[in-house]
């Protein structure tokens, strides 16, 4: 098969798409418009201003689908799941048109918070789009962060790696550490939504900028302390420019490698998508993060007077795959 290999960062505010062989990362506001008195649905890329002029527009499609909500558009009531299906259909048309390919070989979707119901919704979307479920994988932001970092040079992840995300979704902190064992290396990633979060519109005023810089500096002092980090990453729209956060930058740059990457999650999703297409993974580690089991689950058994362990699920197995397997049974 020589189809499209895609990584997608799907959030309530904006969706980012990357595709193997394409340098462009497409950004599309997570909203859909319908032309009046027709069955034509459209999305608009941010590069085109994200405008859907003359259309009835519905946004926050993930939240709408998750709460089984509905929206009335042009006098017709639509389920949130249906609107999400139409949105993904339009979004996937972008890399299809750019590459001239229709078939999707593998699609990895990364989401801010991994929930069983959301995975179900996205699998229903795959059915609607006639993409085999075996080619669709849903992972957490933490897991895409892991694959992005582990694809870098060893010097980047030789010690702990911290990442601050400042976006429309709020302020989040991620931390990765590598645990080397006798059998296999474990990569553990934690994520935290910070209580000190603020909306990006506070950066529109000088007073708001000063407040945001103080908040970030306080968070960095509490989270990083004097620990050794091989890298600190900044991601999200709020860090598109960093000169406004002078005190924060000064603090995190002390004896640390710091770099900004706006598309960590979609790049990580694409890396994971590419790896899943290989006969053997290039990443020889057990990933422990949101959406993955932290410990091995086993039963103590006795067979012919000998005791042993029956492993039901291993550390690093996908929780969503386990759920899907149970549901199928």
Model-predicted regions and their roles:
Residues 2-26, 151-187:
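Gly/Thr-rich phosphate-binding beta-strand-loop-beta motif of the actin/hexokinase/Hsp70
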Residues 82-150, 262:
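Active-site neighborhood for divalent-cation/phosphate handling
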Residues 1-3, 133-163, 264-286:
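Conserved phosphate-binding catalytic cores of ATP/NTP-utilizing and phosphoryl-transfer enzymes
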Residues 145-150, 156, 173-212:
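Short, flexible helix-coil linker/hinge segments at the edges of structured domains or between repeats
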Residues 323-329:
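Conserved small/polar residues in nucleotide/adenosyl-binding loops
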Residues 163-178, 280-310:
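Extended, charge-rich low-complexity interaction segments
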Residues 107-119, 220-251, 257, 261-262:
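Glycine-rich phosphate-binding loops at beta-strand->alpha-helix junctions
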Residues 14-110, 115, 188-225, 229:
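Conserved phosphate-binding loops in N-terminal lobes of ATP-dependent enzymes
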């Amino acid at each position: 098969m020589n189809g499209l290999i895609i990584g997608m960062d799907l959030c309530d505010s904006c969706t980012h798409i990357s595709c193997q062989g394409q340098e462009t990362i497409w950004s599309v506001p997570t909203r859909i418009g319908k032309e009046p008195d027709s069955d034509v649905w459209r999305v608009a890329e941010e590069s085109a201003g994200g405008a859907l002029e003359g259309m009835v527009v519905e946004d926050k499609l993930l939240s709408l689908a998750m709460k089984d909500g509905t929206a009335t558009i042009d006098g017709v009531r639509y389920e949130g799941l249906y609107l999400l299906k139409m949105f993904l259909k339009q979004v996937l048309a972008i890399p299809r048109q750019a590459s001239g390919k229709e078939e999707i070989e593998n699609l990895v979707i990364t989401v801010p918070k991994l929930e069983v119901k959301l995975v179900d919704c996205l699998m229903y979307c795959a059915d609607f789009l006639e993409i085999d479920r075996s080619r669709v994988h849903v992972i957490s932001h933490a897991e895409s962060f892991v694959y992005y970092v582990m694809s870098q040079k060893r010097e980047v992840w030789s010690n702990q790696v911290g990442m601050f995300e400042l976006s429309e979704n709020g302020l989040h902190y991620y931390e990765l550490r590598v645990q080397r064992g006798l059998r296999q290396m474990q990569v553990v990633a934690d994520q935290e939504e910070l209580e000190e979060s603020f909306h990006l519109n506070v950066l529109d005023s000088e007073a708001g900028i000063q407040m945001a810089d103080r908040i970030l500096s306080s968070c960095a002092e509490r989270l990083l302390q004097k620990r050794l980090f091989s890298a600190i990453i900044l991601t999200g729209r709020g860090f598109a420019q960093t000169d406004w956060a002078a005190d924060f930058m000064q603090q995190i740059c002390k004896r640390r490698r710091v770099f900004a990457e706006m598309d960590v999650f979609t790049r990580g999703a694409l890396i994971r998508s590419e790896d899943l297409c290989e006969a053997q993974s290039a990443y020889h580690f057990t990933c422990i993060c949101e959406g993955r089991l932290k410990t091995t689950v086993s039963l103590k058994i006795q067979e012919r007077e000998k005791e042993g362990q029956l492993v039901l699920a291993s550390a690093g197995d996908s929780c969503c795959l386990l759920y899907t397997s149970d549901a199928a049974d």
